[in-house]
């Protein structure tokens, strides 16, 4: 079903994605890379909390302005018929919007009439990402009426990628939570001991495992100055 070039694209994409350990980089990168395999006009990568609410600051949207992002996250997410699937699936699953509801039913929903149709994104597909029996995210691609619906080959590609994406997202989210905890500890340490902004910056880089030379290159100061800051810390 796939050409050799398409298989190579998938392999190279996964190899690159597995090296990413920052959540915002991961979500933006995958949304951009997937276009090489599945053309789309707009899309989003939604991150969900334990209550299936959108973690707005950590979610990534492409092709939408801020007003539309806010309308979806604040109003239309609760009306999105994708939630019909939430209670019926137990593992990471690929879906196509036109397969969730019959067209005559779908086109009468508020979500279709007030959001999808005005934004000209009437065709959609994606992945509901589940790890340890919990929905952790939702990956959605959209097309306008002119571009047409997503086909079986494109859904096949998503099925090939789905478990990789779920595993990568789970790992990156775990690292993100750990990073937030560490940053809070570093900030508290800096406040307690009255570190300067430069000393705080160097402390953060040390925590990331950078050598004195790497810190010197990054903040554009000499290695000897780096050592002086470390001594003060």
At which residue positions do the language-model features occur?
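Recognition helix of helix-turn-helix DNA-binding domains
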Residues: 210-233
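Signal-transmission/dimerization alpha-helices at domain junctions
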Residues: 157-176
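Pre-recognition alpha-helix immediately N-terminal to the DNA-recognition helix
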Residues: 12, 200-205
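Signal-transmission linkers at sensory-effector interfaces
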Residues: 1-19
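Regulatory loop-to-helix N-cap segments in sensory/regulatory domains
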Residues: 2, 143-158
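Regulatory hinge/linker segments at domain boundaries
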Residues: 176-201
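Glycine-rich acetyl-CoA-binding "A-motif" of GNAT/NAT acetyltransferases
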Residues: 135
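Regulatory input/activation interfaces that engage signals or partners
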Residues: 13-21, 29-132, 141-144
